[in-house]
Regions:
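Extracellular/lumenal mature domains of secreted and surface-exposed proteins
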Residues: 1-127
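Phosphate-group recognition and catalysis centered on beta-loop-alpha active-site segments
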Residues: 26-30, 108-382
Length: 382
C-alpha cells in the first residue's frame, strides 16, 4: 500500500515543524492467499495471490480433478469447494509481463461437512441432536465441557452438534466452561473459598483445577481451551458456542480463535438477541455464523434479518407448532429438553418430546443424546 510517514521536529529554539514522506510498499514475491487451509467439504474457499505487480494471468489447479480456472491478475479471486474429504495440492501457474512464469503450491486438507451447506440442504423430515455441554449421561459419568465428554459424543456417532460455553481468562485466552466462575464445575473450593472468577486467573493458573461431574465428583479433566477443542474435533462434529452475548466475553477473541482453527464454517456463535454482536459477526470477512434466540415475532423478524443465520433457538415453553412453523419459515428451529423435562424423558416420559416432533423442531438440545437418537429413530427422524 501507499503510506505517508510524518515526523514532528522540535528544535532547541523556535517552533515545531512537520516533515513528511510518501512511501509505496509492494510485494516482491508472489504468494498464494487462501481463506482456509483446513476447510470443511462444500465450504467455499477463496483463493487469490498477494498484491504482486506485473502479473498478467494465473492458471489454477485445485488438485481435485476439477477443471482448471483462469484469472487475469493477482488481485482477482476465485472460490472453490471440495466435495470429498482428503488432502489436495493446489497449484497456481503465474505468468508475468516480462515473459517469466512461476508455479506456486499450497496444501489443503478438507474434513467434515460445511455447516452452512448442511443447513441449506437440511432434510426437514429429520431432526439433529445437540449435546448440551457435551453431556451424554447428563454429566454424571464425564464432566460437562470436558475433552473426555466431547470425545464420548463423537464416539457415539449420533451427535451433530456439541454445545459448549466460552469464557475469557485474565490473560485473554478463550476457555470452555459454563460459568464465569470456578466453584460450581471445578475443585476450586478445595484450594480457596468464594466463587473464583475466571477473569481473575491466567490460563496457566487455571491449569491446577480439575473439572467436576454434575453430582460434584472431581475428575482428572482440566478446563480445555477453545483452541484445543476445535483443533481436535474439527471435521468430526459442529459446535454451538454459548455465552457469546455476555459482556465479559469478547466476541472478537472468540472469533479469532475460531478463524485461526479454520472452523468458521463448523461453528455457530450463540448471541441470543444481541443485535450489536450479530451485526459485528455479519461484517467480518469471513463472516461468523450467527445463532440467535427468539420467543417473539418482533425478535424473530429482527434477528432473522442478519446473515448468515441458519438456526434460531426458542425456549421450551414457546416451542408449539405455530411458533416453530414461524421459525422454520426463516431458519431451522432449535429448542431444549433439559433439567426436569430432560430427566423425565430419560425415565421414559416422552410427552414433551412428542410435541416437539409433531411441531417440526429441527434440532433438539439435550443431555442424553444416545437415548434421544434411539427415540428419534423409532419415529423415523434420523
Amino acid at each position: 500500500g501507499d503510506y505517508t510517514v510524518k515526523a514532528a521536529v522540535t528544535p532547541v529554539a523556535g517552533s515545531m515543524s512537520e516533515l513528511s514522506r510518501s512511501i509505496s510498499v509492494s510485494d516482491t514475491e508472489a504468494a498464494m492467499v487462501v481463506s482456509n487451509d483446513f476447510p470443511a467439504c462444500r465450504e467455499e474457499v477463496v483463493f487469490s495471490l498477494n498484491r504482486m505487480t506485473g502479473v498478467t494471468g494465473v492458471s489454477w489447479d485445485f488438485g481435485d480433478g476439477s477443471e482448471r480456472r483462469q484469472t487475469a491478475s493477482a488481485s482477482e479471486t476465485l472460490t472453490h469447494s471440495y466435495a470429498e474429504e482428503g488432502r489436495y495440492t493446489v497449484r497456481a501457474e503465474v505468468a508475468y509481463a516480462d515473459g517469466g512464469t512461476e508455479t506456486l503450491m499450497r496444501q489443503i486438507e478438507a474434513a467434515g461437512l460445511s455447516l452452512s451447506w448442511a443447513c441449506r440442504n437440511f432434510d426437514p423430515s429429520k431432526m439433529w441432536i445437540m449435546a448440551h455441554r457435551g453431556n451424554t449421561k447428563n454429566g454424571y459419568e464425564l464432566p460437562p465441557n470436558s475433552m473426555a465428554a466431547f470425545r464420548r459424543c463423537v464416539e457415539l456417532g449420533c451427535v451433530e452438534f456439541i454445545e459448549t460455553d466460552v469464557q475469557i481468562t485474565k490473560d485473554g485466552e478463550v476457555i470452555c466452561l459454563h460459568d464465569n466462575y470456578l466453584s460450581r464445575f471445578t475443585d476450586y473450593n478445595d484450594y480457596a473459598s468464594g466463587k473464583g472468577m475466571v477473569a481473575d486467573f491466567t490460563l496457566e493458573e487455571l491449569g491446577r483445577f480439575r473439572l467436576k461431574t454434575t453430582d460434584g465428583k472431581v475428575s482428572d479433566q482440566k478446563i480445555p481451551t477453545l483452541e484445543e477443542v476445535l483443533m481436535e474435533f474439527r471435521g468430526k462434529v459442529w459446535f454451538n458456542l454459548d455465552k457469546c452475548m455476555e459482556s465479559d466475553v469478547s466476541i472478537e477473541k472468540v472469533y479469532d480463535v475460531v478463524e485461526r482453527c479454520g472452523c468458521l464454517d463448523r461453528v455457530q456463535f450463540y448471541i441470543s438477541d444481541d443485535t450489536d454482536r450479530a451485526d459485528w459477526l455479519s461484517r467480518q470477512k469471513p463472516q461468523g455464523i450467527i445463532a440467535p434466540h427468539a420467543n417473539k415475532e418482533e425478535v424473530l423478524t429482527r434477528m432473522a434479518a442478519y446473515s448468515p443465520v441458519y438456526m434460531i433457538q426458542t425456549s421450551t415453553q414457546y416451542a408449539g407448532a405455530s411458533w416453530i412453523s414461524s421459525i422454520n419459515a426463516r431458519a431451522l428451529s432449535v429448542t431444549n429438553l433439559l433439567d426436569d423435562e430432560g430427566q423425565a424423558f430419560y425415565n421414559g416420559n416422552t410427552t414433551v418430546m412428542d410435541g416437539f416432533v409433531s411441531a417440526g423442531v429441527r434440532m433438539i438440545q439435550c443431555d442424553y443424546p444416545a437415548e434421544m437418537d434411539e427415540y428419534l429413530r423409532g419415529r423415523g427422524k434420523r
